[in-house]
Amino acid sequence: MPDMKLFAGNSIPKLAKFIAHRLYINLGNAAVGRFSDGEISVQINENVRGSDVFIIQSTCSPTNDNIMELVVMVDALRRASAGRITAVIPYFGYSRQDRRVRSARVPITAKVVADFLSSIGVDRVLTVDLHAEQIQGFFDVPVDNVFGSLILLEDMLQRELKNPIVVSPDIGGVVRARAIAKLLYDTDMAIIDKRRPRPNISQIMHIIGDVANRDCILVDDMIDTGGTLCKAAEALKERGAKRVFAYATHPIFSGKASENLKKSVIDEVVVCDTIPLEEKIRLLPNVRTLTLAGMLAEAIRRISNEESISAMFEH
C-alpha cells in the first residue's frame, strides 16, 4: 500500500492540523508562501515519490488565491512523482455559479474550476456538502461529496428541543430540510417563501407551516451575509416561534454578517469549520463551531485504503 501523506495550504490550517491528529500522522513538510511580487511560491521539502497524497485546502475567501495555491501545490507534487493526488476541499468556492440563468451571458464558473483542477493532475476530489450536487458531474475525476450536515444533526439530537420543526429558508432547500426532519424524530417541516431582488438582498414573504410555540431549526448549506437567515428568524418569531436555531455547514460570513448576527433574534447559529471564522464572528456569543476533522479524517483513511465512503453514512 502506498505511503499516505497529508499536505495543507494556507486556507484552513487549524482544520488540517486536527485532521492530521486524527490520522496519527504529521502534516507534510511544504513551504507555501509568496514571492515579493505576490506570486505563489511552493516547495515540497520531503520525498513523495509514489505516495498517496492528500492536499487540504478550502477555496474560500480569498477564493482566487486559495484556488491558485491548491493548483500550484498539485503541480509541485505531480512533478515530484506523487503516486496519487486527492484534493480535499471542505468548502468548494464558486459552487453557487453552477448554471446559466435562462439566456444570460454568464459563465458556469463551478465548471471552469472543476476543469482547471481536473486538467492539472488532481486524481480525486473530497468535498463537503456541495451547494449543488450536479457539480460532481463537472469533474473528469471521481468526487466524494460527504455530508457535513450529519455532524450538525448530531448536535440537534443532543438539544432539549420543545416541539421542534425543521425550517427551510427557501424553496431550494426543501430536499435538505426534509432529509434532516426525517432524521430528527421524523418531525414536521416548514418553508419560508422569499423573493431576492438582487444578490445578497432578500425579502421574507410568508411562512408555509405552523411554527407557533415551537422550537424552529433553520437548516441551510451555507450562510453568506446572514441577511436571509436573520430575516427568516424575525419572521418565525413574529409567527410565534419559541426559539430559533440556525444550522449551516459553510460559514462564509461575508459583508455585514457580523452586524446582522449581532442584532439577530436567532438563539444560536451552529456551523462547521470548513472556513475559518474572523475573530469578530468567532467572539459572538450566539455563534458556535463544530469540527469536521473526524469525518474528513475517516473519509481520507477510507480513500487511501480503497474502502467505501458511502458506508460511512449508512444507518
From Swiss-Prot:
GO cellular component, one term: ribose phosphate diphosphokinase complex
UniProt xrefs under Pfam families: Pribosyl_synth (PF14572), Pribosyltran_N (PF13793)
GO terms classed as biological process: 5-phosphoribose 1-diphosphate biosynthetic process; purine nucleotide biosynthetic process; ribonucleoside monophosphate biosynthetic process
Main location: cytoplasm
Catalytic activity: D-ribose 5-phosphate + ATP = 5-phospho-alpha-D-ribose 1-diphosphate + AMP + H(+)
Keyword match Kinase: yes
GO molecular function, one term: ATP binding
Comment on bound cofactor: Binds 2 Mg(2+) ions per subunit.
Binding site for D-ribose 5-phosphate: 196, 220, 224-228
CDD domains found in the cross-reference section: PRTases_typeI
Annotated ATP binding sites: 37-39, 96-97
Cofactor field: Mg(2+)
UniProt: Mg(2+) 1 binding residues: 131
Protein localization: Cytoplasm
Record-linked InterPro entries: PRib_PP_synth_CS, Pribosyltran_N, PRibTrfase_dom, PRTase-like, Rib-P_diPkinase, Rib-P_diPkinase_bac
Ligand binding (Mg(2+) 2): 170
Enzyme Commission numbers on file: 2.7.6.1
Family: Belongs to the ribose-phosphate pyrophosphokinase family. Class I subfamily.
Subunit annotation: Homohexamer.
Function: Involved in the biosynthesis of the central metabolite phospho-alpha-D-ribosyl-1-pyrophosphate (PRPP) via the transfer of pyrophosphoryl group from ATP to 1-hydroxyl of ribose-5-phosphate (Rib-5-P).
Protein name as annotated: Ribose-phosphate pyrophosphokinase
Lineage: Bacteria, Pseudomonadati, Pseudomonadota, Gammaproteobacteria, Enterobacterales
